[in-house]
Amino acid sequence: MSSWNPTSKLYAKTTQIPDLFHDITKSPNIYTLLLELLGAYIYSNSQNLSCIVYDPNGTLKKIIIFNPILKFVTTRPDNTNEITGSDILCAINSIKPQQVKAYAEALFRYTQRLTFFISQILQKASIRLGATDISLHIYHVSQINKYVHEIRDYQKKTEAKKISVYLMAETADNITQFKRAADPSWTVLNINKLDINDDSELFITNLAEVEILATSKAVILDYTNPIDRLVFIKRRNKMDESFVKEVDNKPWFLV
């Protein structure tokens, strides 16, 4: 006679899928870190899975508020499925830029403390978000003529007699050289950060400038720099993108 037991389970044991995993310590700088985190976030959403984010110093908890898809941990976990660069690239290439911006808006919700510091910087500089006509970020003096040409083209197309230009720059020489090349009808604005020696303060100031560029009516970017790629995805979907220029006409990419 068969020894079959009618109470035994006839179904196979469910195989548990390992959590997705992202390690921020591999990022070369904080701005690339944010872009790569966005890539991991988009990929996790595409797989309908949560993601464990290895953040040993608690950096991200100081920047963005809780997100149900991401779980920040300070100890590297075992039995995880690490997200690769190819995973991120496939996820990004499968959606439109407008969708990337929507994901960025959902992810980059700054903490109350960080938002306060950014507001203080803008208030001290007397800069109101959305009030600047055109903004740019200069890295090299050799690029100035290209930026000047683009700004003149913008002014011609808008038929504005006077315009406000926000300049994000890393050196005093870049600021001086640009102001020399600027037309008299331009009001050039910038935040003085050249005397900042603290990395955290500089990062917050740069984030404030990202907000200025992201809300400016027009912007000229250089996608070789992660800050400018961050600016692009933080620009609101409803904004007129016809005045978003890349200094060398390169296409936008995440990482």
Feature roles, as predicted:
Residues 55-62, 171-173, 249-252:
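Short beta-alpha junction loops
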Residues 185-216:
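Donor nucleotide-activated moiety binding/catalytic core segment of transferases
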Residues 42-51, 152-164, 180-190, 238-242:
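Structural alpha-beta junctions
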Residues 161-165, 216-219:
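Short active-site oxyanion
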Residues 1-151, 157:
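Secretory-pathway glycan-assembly enzymes, especially type II membrane glycosyltransferases
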Residues 54-56, 137-138, 166-171, 220-224:
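Short His-Asn-centered micro-motif
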Residues 206-251:
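A donor-sugar binding/catalytic signature common to diverse glycosyltransferases
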